[in-house]
């Protein structure tokens, strides 16, 4: 029997949902296993650091399951240094909130402690995902070490033809990857601890992120030579449910006729409603404008240009403005 450091599996909250629902089979396999809450200025509890490796076909004992509760910009403005002055004014609240969760984690005492303990990789998953079978993680982590991969992104943003490279090829899992570009996602990924520390250090030194977060991450990757791969067909292993975020957005809107219509539509068209409610820009920090809001603004411009005088159209447009802008 050998003792090794456990690989942390960290659930990052983006919606109101228990972390256990991201890994629904966790408690089924290890009855006494619970998520440890870790927030700013805390480290992983000692009892979770070491595991005796033995017959464990489901691999749950390889990992320390963590619920990250730090980086909440709603409660504290100490994370503003992650963003430039322009982004603090023009980036949407949702964008800043979600990015700050990850950057605060990478910049935390928790990650510094992991580096000191020689923990190589961390698995990070936002809680609007579901991973039912984690057995793919063990061979993936080994392959990442062998192939010197710094980040493995487990959600695809752009689909199409890519040049794929074999990552894992065994009797249970066949996994390919391709090199990432500007298609950056923080939804689910495995990252080398030292890489996370280096990225956040570069962001802070440059004065914080501007509005083009994903372009800036790609730029930093090129500058400090980070090898980021994207898992091909990642939805087979990590299920992302756009309905959960879309419902969360409607629940946080002011209650009105259109928000109720939207809540009902989410159940039938989750992908469409997720896209329509995605915030695009903040109006000087006063309110965020999403895709529906942008359409409404363009429609208002159309009515003004063509001098539309229909009271019904102006009334309906006004209700959209109060609901989505």
From Swiss-Prot:
InterPro entries attached to this UniProt entry: Poxvirus_P35
Miscellaneous comment as given in the Swiss-Prot or TrEMBL entry: Immunodominant protein.
Function description: Envelope protein that binds to heparan sulfate on the cell surface and might provide virion attachment to target cell.
Alphabetic keyword roster: Host-virus interaction, Late protein, Membrane, Signal-anchor, Transmembrane, Transmembrane helix, Viral attachment to host cell, Viral envelope protein, Virion, Virus entry into host cell
Bilayer topology annotation: Single-pass membrane protein
GO biological process terms held by the UniProt record: symbiont entry into host cell; virion attachment to host cell
Bilayer-crossing regions: 286-306
Intravirion side: 307-325
Coiled coil: none
GO cellular-component term (any): membrane
The protein, known as: Envelope protein H3
Family in the record: Belongs to the orthopoxvirus OPG108 family.
Pfam families: Pox_P35 (PF03213)
Gene: OPG108
Highest taxon in the source lineage: Viruses
Signal peptide: none
Post-translational modification: Does not contain disulfide bonds.
